[in-house]
């Protein structure tokens, strides 16, 4: 096993953007292991759609309506935010094939702006964003499963958290067992939630055919039920943008895509318009059966919709929400574990997280780390508060990443770009992003300030854990022993990869401060010890 741990130093040093297939290298060399390219176009679409469409469209699409002030303006907000999301996704598509590494915006920010910027993106994701989001989705799943058993009261809190933990453990086992199993689960549950939403849309069309379209007539659709306010409209756009969250998750698994140069942009072209269509027409369907006041008063819009129109079949809606959230947990586990895997590979997280199973070729340590951090969030009571604090930071890094696309065009105009979008796209996205960011700072300065403070706690961690390379020998020996024990327990080794630079787990000092992605291999300091 020690030999497996050392094989990262014997792998060929290749450019991160190399197009060599990992399977080809593994089979042609010495039998090394590597991440497998098992995600086809259908599964890629399932990852995007499954991560965007969670429980929100079923449970609480009222956030946009409440702030927009009218049905018509709310529908416009859903359409515009869908278009802006598509624009941002196209920018990420260019970055994804220019810097074809797993890790998504973390990898892009690190390669373009340097190690500290990338680490801060990773730090906030590891510390709060993914553990809290996954915990909330799992709790939503358990709530909709248990609610029918407690028709006259709320399910017990301990029962909710226990079932959420079981959900997380089950899906972690699936993801550890096989990439193919994980993507099949994602495909099935994404199809299920789309079928449920298709049912809602079809019923809305039936309602329109019956003449139930009072709130869709222009004079009624734009009738304000509150005083128009530009600040509230901005909040509506912010709520809409959050509803499309997850559109960038496919970039986290770029190295496992079959033919990423084709399938990454294709999946984006298919998925984002599909989600926009579903969101807009689901909201149209809702207002054919409910007035804006009824919609705003409902705690679970799809359930209320089902009770009004489905009669004895109303049970379909809560089951649909449960299935949707179950698939959402799976998709988030799958993609976030690849983010942590990529961070460990770059030396920003413990190196054991950059290892994969010798037979299954799944990043088991990263998956277990993701699961454990989420389980810890389940036993805390302040995770919703944490989400509010760091939601602003998460959105901040979307803009930083897209700005990096412009910087990369300027600094490295000649590097290969299989996809090259018009510069108008990142400019449009950044203008929209700046509008929302400035308004967020103005309307909730304390919340945004706390979010920034949480992110900046990563600065001393970076300098102590990453920048400071000459640590005491006793510390290095302890980490090496801990890594070896973890490696034996999980039966994992460092992967041999020819397309991602996965064999490097630390950066040298010079590379840490380079602001722009350089298409030359990074020299692994450990390799200097080899004869």
UniProtKB/Swiss-Prot annotation:
Mode of membrane association: Multi-pass membrane protein
Family statement: Belongs to the amino acid-polyamine-organocation (APC) superfamily. L-type amino acid transporter (LAT) (TC 2.A.3.8) family.
Location of region: Disordered: 1-29, 499-531
Protein name (Swiss-Prot/TrEMBL): Large neutral amino acids transporter small subunit 2
Function of the molecule: Associates with SLC3A2 to form a functional heterodimeric complex that translocates small and large neutral amino acids with broad specificity and a stoichiometry of 1:1. Functions as amino acid antiporter mediating the influx of extracellular essential amino acids mainly in exchange with the efflux of highly concentrated intracellular amino acids. Has relatively symmetrical selectivities but strongly asymmetrical substrate affinities at both the intracellular and extracellular sides of the transporter.
Residues the record lists as binding L-tryptophan: 133, 394
Membrane-side (Extracellular) residue stretches: 65-72, 149-156, 210-229, 287-311, 382-385
Positions marked as site (Important for substrate specificity): 133, 245
An example Gene Ontology biological process: glycine transport
Tissues showing expression: Strongly expressed in kidney and small intestine. Moderately present in placenta, ovary and brain. Expressed in the inner ear.
Transmembrane segments: 44-64, 73-94, 116-148, 157-177, 181-209, 230-251, 265-286, 312-337, 364-381, 386-407, 423-445, 446-465
Biased composition (Polar residues): 7-21
Gene name of the encoded protein: Slc7a8
Effect of disrupting the coding gene: Slc7a8-deficient mice present normal development and growth. Only a slightly altered coordination of movements is observed in Slc7a8-deficient mice. Circulating thyroid hormones, thyrotropin and thyroid hormone-responsive genes remain unchange. Functional compensation by other amino acid transporters might explain the lack of a severe phenotype. The lack of Slc7a8 results in a significant increase of cataracts in old animals, in particularly in old females.
Pfam family, one: AA_permease_2
GO cellular component: apical plasma membrane; basolateral plasma membrane; microvillus membrane; plasma membrane
Keywords: Amino-acid transport, Antiport, Cell membrane, Disulfide bond, Membrane, Phosphoprotein, Transmembrane, Transmembrane helix, Transport
Localization per Swiss-Prot or TrEMBL: Cell membrane; Basolateral cell membrane
Positions bearing Phosphoserine: 18, 21, 27-28, 527
Result of changing residue 242 to W: Increases T2 import. Does not affect T3 import. Does not affect L-leucine and L-phenylalanine uptake
């Amino acid at each position: 096993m020690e030999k497996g741990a050392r094989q990262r130093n014997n792998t060929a040093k290749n450019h991160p953007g190399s197009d060599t297939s990992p399977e080809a290298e593994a089979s042609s060399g010495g039998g090394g292991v590597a991440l497998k390219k098992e995600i086809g176009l259908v599964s890629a679409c399932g990852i995007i759609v499954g991560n965007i469409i969670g429980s929100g469209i079923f449970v609480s699409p009222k956030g946009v309506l409440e702030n927009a002030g009218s049905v018509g303006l709310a529908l416009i907000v859903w359409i515009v935010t869908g278009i802006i999301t598509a624009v941002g996704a196209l920018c990420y598509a260019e970055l994804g094939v220019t810097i074809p590494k797993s890790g998504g915006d973390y990898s892009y920010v690190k390669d373009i702006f340097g190690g500290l910027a990338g680490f801060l993106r990773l730090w906030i994701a590891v510390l709060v964003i993914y553990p809290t989001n996954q915990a909330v989705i799992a709790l939503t799943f358990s709530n909709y499963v248990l609610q029918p058993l407690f028709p006259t009261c709320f399910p017990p809190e301990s029962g909710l958290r226990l079932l959420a933990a079981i959900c997380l453990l089950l899906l972690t086992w699936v993801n550890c067992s096989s990439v193919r199993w994980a993507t099949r689960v994602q495909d099935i549950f994404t199809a299920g939630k789309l079928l449920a939403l298709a049912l809602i849309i079809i019923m809305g069309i039936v309602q329109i055919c019956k003449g139930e379209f009072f709130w869709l007539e222009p004079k009624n659709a734009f009738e304000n039920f509150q005083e128009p306010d530009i600040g509230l409209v901005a909040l509506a756009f912010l709520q809409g943008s959050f509803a499309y969250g997850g559109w960038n998750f496919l970039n986290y698994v770029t190295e496992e895509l079959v033919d990423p140069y084709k399938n990454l942009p294709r999946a984006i072209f298919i998925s984002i318009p599909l989600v926009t269509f579903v969101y807009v027409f689901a909201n149209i369907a809702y207002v054919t059966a409910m007035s804006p006041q009824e919609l705003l008063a409902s705690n679970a819009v799809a359930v209320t919709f089902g009770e009004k129109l489905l009669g004895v079949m109303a049970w379909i809606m809560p089951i649909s929400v449960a299935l949707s959230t179950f698939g959402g947990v799976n998709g988030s586990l799958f993609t976030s574990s690849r983010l942590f895997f990529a961070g460990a590979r770059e030396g920003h997280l413990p190196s054991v997280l950059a290892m994969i199973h010798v037979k299954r070729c799944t990043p088991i340590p990263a998956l277990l780390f993701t699961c454990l951090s989420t389980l810890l969030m389940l036993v805390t009571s302040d995770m919703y508060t944490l989400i509010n604090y760091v939601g602003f930071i998460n959105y901040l890094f979307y803009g930083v990443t897209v700005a990096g696309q412009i910087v990369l065009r300027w600094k490295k105009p000649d590097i290969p770009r299989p996809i090259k979008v018009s510069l108008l796209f990142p400019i449009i996205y950044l203008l929209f992003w700046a509008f929302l960011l400035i308004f967020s700072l103005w309307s909730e300065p304390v919340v945004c300030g706390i979010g920034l403070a949480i992110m900046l706690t990563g600065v001393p961690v970076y300098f102590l854990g990453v920048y400071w390379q000459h640590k005491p020998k006793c510390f290095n020996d302890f980490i090496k022993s801990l890594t070896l024990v973890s490696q034996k327990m999980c039966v994992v080794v460092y992967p041999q990869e020819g397309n991602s630079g996965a064999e490097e787990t630390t950066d040298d000092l010079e590379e840490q401060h380079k602001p722009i992605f350089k298409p030359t291999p990074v020299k692994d300091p450990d390799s200097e010890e080899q004869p």
